[in-house]
């Protein structure tokens, strides 16, 4: 008996909306990454993108446990000698509230073309409003 592989044109991608208010960042990000990959579906294959679209609202109200607001640092490099920059989670939330969730989910996805394509299906917004009402997203309680 052969393993069933759904053809790419038959894969139905659903839309989900997640409210991030008072949700712990890592727990929320791991569930989102799993849904973006399609691991919750019985037709999951690691080499086929059959994940769903996820819309995250209230990104500015995400929660971190312990002293992570001050201790957790994000690094980036300018490309120049000695050009490493670091930002705490609190500073990142003030400047770019959506990046906190996006960076957490990106770290949980594959580091290849498919991972980049799956990350494009993640839509993160500040506040409760989002422009994807036409897709009729289902509320996902995590």
Curated annotation (Swiss-Prot):
InterPro entries for this protein: Ribosomal_uL13, Ribosomal_uL13_bac-type, Ribosomal_uL13_CS, Ribosomal_uL13_sf
Transmembrane intervals: none
Functional note: This protein is one of the early assembly proteins of the 50S ribosomal subunit, although it is not seen to bind rRNA by itself. It is important during the early stages of 50S assembly.
Protein name: Large ribosomal subunit protein uL13
One annotated GO biological process: translation
Keywords (A to Z) from UniProt: Ribonucleoprotein, Ribosomal protein
Similarity section: Belongs to the universal ribosomal protein uL13 family.
PANTHER family in UniProt: LARGE RIBOSOMAL SUBUNIT PROTEIN UL13M, RIBOSOMAL PROTEIN L13
Record flagged with keyword Ribonucleoprotein: yes
Pfam families attached to this UniProt entry: Ribosomal_L13
Disulfide bond recorded as keyword: no
Assembly and oligomerization: Part of the 50S ribosomal subunit.
GO cellular component: cytosolic large ribosomal subunit
Gene Ontology molecular functions: mRNA binding; structural constituent of ribosome
């Amino acid at each position: 008996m052969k393993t069933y592989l759904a053809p790419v044109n038959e894969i139905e991608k659903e839309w989900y909306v997640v409210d991030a208010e008072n949700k712990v960042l890592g727990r929320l990000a791991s569930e989102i990454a799993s849904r973006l990959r399609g691991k919750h579906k019985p037709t999951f294959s690691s080499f086929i993108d059959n994940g769903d679209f996820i819309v995250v609202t209230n990104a500015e109200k995400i929660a971190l446990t312990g002293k992570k607001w001050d201790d957790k640092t994000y690094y980036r490099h300018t490309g120049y000698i000695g050009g490493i920059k670091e930002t705490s989670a609190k500073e990142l939330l003030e400047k770019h509230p959506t990046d906190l969730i996006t960076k957490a989910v990106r770290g949980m996805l594959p580091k290849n073309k498919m991972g980049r394509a799956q990350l494009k299906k993640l839509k993160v917004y500040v506040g409760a409003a989002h422009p994807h009402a036409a897709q009729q997203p289902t509320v996902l309680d995590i």
